[in-house]
Amino acid sequence: MRYTAVIRTLGNAGMYYQKTLESIAQQTIKPDRIIVYLAESYEIPKETIGVERYIYVPKGMVAQRALSYYEVDTEYILFLDDDVYLPPEAVSRLYNELQQYNANVISPCTFQNHKQRTLSKVFKAITGKERPMFTNNRWSYKVMRTAGFAYNNNPSKPVYESQSNAGPCFFCKKNDFLNISFGEELWLDKTYYALPEDQVMFYKMYKKGLKVLTSFDSGIVHLDAGTTMQSNPERECRLVFSEYRNKLIFWHRFIFLPDHNPLSRFMSVLALGYALTIQFIKCIVYFLIGKSKTAKAFFDGINDAKCYLKSDEYKSLPLI
């Protein structure tokens, strides 16, 4: 098996990036090449292992991943962010699990939702963002009608099928990735934060007929998990705007439009309406405690999404 490791970066991950490079070099199955897709106008980082090739591309979480990969001449690609640690056997394990389960895409569980505190699980379930699944022995993640996701609350097997995943690392054939036409989802990059770009990508893989897996025994670690999104008032507003603008577009494009069953569509409308109502109630609280800008960001995000859904650009996108 031959593969190429590709990394998207702004070049400012520092020691995390160095650890990523070193862990790639220590793989028992080494990549043919390491190609780093660096956002335009950013400097090449000083961290190195001496074998990386840099290619400048437009900036964006989607733009730096939805590429043609002409430079890749291997059948498989290991996709990485710039802050991921891989144990020496990681790629070998991912490849073997891919073959064992006759699947197309595999991603490690780098965000362990099932290990959250109970109060956090309850709160997120109430908001419709994410909820635990207690009796599911097939899926690790499933996309919900609210445009959120459900996660396996007690994973007891090394590998599960999935409809979504975290995106700092995944492994698949080059052609399988190209066939999902991820460049059609560049609308995600038009906000301050492209979230939920990972969910959009993996769910599109699933909708296109690819079998997606989550590995719980790879040992792969997202080194910067939970630190890059530390909140301040301005960032919180940008996150709220981005989340609800992109969530509404995702819901309409991936959940509502592809569903031709009137009753099922109605259930999806009710589910989204519930999630938005809960957020509206939160906005009232924001106003009462003096966080009116955060509340405004929610309404601005929804309005921006509505405008985009009416645009010629959106209407020209191929249907899922």
Locations of the language-model features?
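N-proximal low-complexity "stem/linker" segments adjacent to membrane-targeting elements
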Residues: 1-25
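Glycine-rich, basic loop-to-helix element that forms the pyrophosphate-binding segment
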Residues: 56-72
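Conserved donor NDP-sugar-binding/catalytic core segment of glycosyltransferases
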Residues: 89-136
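A recurrent flexible, glycine/aromatic-enriched loop bordering the glycosyltransferase active site
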Residues: 138-146, 151-172, 193-194
